[in-house]
């Protein structure tokens, strides 16, 4: 049997990824389409322990000072464990997976740390090989990128609880404006590089509603 399909919704922090996944789930349920949904990092699993430590600042408060290679391994292990324990058989038997973030988020947040073009390309090639060849994780069938400029996403995140402790205190990515700007700028390049489907969340300075997206 052919392997299944993996559809990823990614985007800048606060862009509405979780909301759009929920709307897809409701539509699939209504139409009787079988699927599995997953969110990364998988905070409900022990496999995300190092990710939580990283985002809480236990390895340092400045994400720029933490190697993108090292940080990426934390997320990759979480994805591997979640895939092996949660949906490998389902996917290999033709199942449909809806993912809120994926390897794509590492591309955005970690590659954005690297200023040199050649070094950034080297990192992206390494990450692809690491997750899709070494770990043999599924390559996305399609990535939908929610493009929301930082000035809008930060306003939406102001009063939002973080997903680790569910408190208002932001993680080291969310509270670092420069990191978010670098990640956003990198994402705009990756959309073209990997042919992601870009969904613009703002038009003429007006924020689209979740239904419009």
Where do the language-model regions lie?
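ATP-dependent small-molecule kinase phosphotransfer cores
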Residues: 33-135
């Amino acid at each position: 049997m052919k392997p299944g399909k993996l559809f990823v919704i990614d985007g800048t922090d606060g862009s509405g990824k979780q909301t759009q996944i929920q709307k897809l789930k409701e539509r699939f349920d209504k139409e009787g389409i079988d699927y599995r949904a997953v969110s990364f990092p998988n905070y409900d699993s022990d496999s995300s322990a190092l990710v939580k430590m990283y985002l809480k600042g236990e390895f340092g408060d400045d994400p720029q000072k933490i190697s993108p290679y090292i940080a990426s391994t934390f997320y990759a292990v979480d994805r591997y464990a979640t895939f092996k324990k949660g949906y490998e058989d389902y996917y290999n038997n033709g199942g449909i997976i809806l993912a809120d973030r994926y390897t794509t988020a590492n591309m955005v947040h970690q590659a954005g740390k690297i200023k040199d073009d050649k070094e950034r390309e080297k990192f992206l090639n390494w990450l692809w090989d690491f997750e899709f060849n070494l770990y043999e994780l599924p390559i996305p069938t399609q990535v939908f990128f929610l493009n929301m400029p930082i000035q809008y996403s930060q306003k939406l995140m102001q009063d939002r609880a973080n997903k680790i402790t569910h408190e208002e205190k932001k993680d080291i990515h969310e509270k670092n404006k420069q990191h978010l700007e670098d990640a956003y700028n990198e994402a705009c390049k990756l959309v073209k590089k990997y042919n992601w489907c870009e969904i613009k969340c703002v038009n003429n300075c007006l924020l689209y509603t979740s239904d419009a997206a």
